[in-house]
Amino acid sequence: LAVLKIVADTSFLMIPGLFRVDIFAELNRILQRRYEILVPEPVVKELEYLSRRGTPSERSAARLALSTLDQMKILPSSSESADLTILEVAKKHPDYLVATADYLLQKRLQKLGVNIIRLRQRTHLMLEREIE
């Protein structure tokens, strides 16, 4: 089986700090195969900004997210926008999954037919469609 590629946005990487959900354990549970998490550069910039300028809970969640980046791969991007970068990557790579807790981004990705990993009931992750 090929290694699954998962593009993560800021909202997804903030889940452990905001909702105390272990995203790695959850990804292992729902995917049951090897995966690599890809983080677009603008997402890293958003996390860095939130770690300095967010609300107290955002700051600690962003710091926690930044501390896990060494287990992920950073995707260089020419765009400043995290959402646009994610949409571009998803269009270019239809087999990639996108992990996001952002409802509006989920809607845009659904229109493209992208398989989404999302947070359910603030307690666990869910895969929108089974992986072929």
Locate each region found by the language model.
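Domain-level signal for Mg2+-assisted phosphodiester chemistry and nucleotide/NA-binding surfaces
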Residues: 1-71
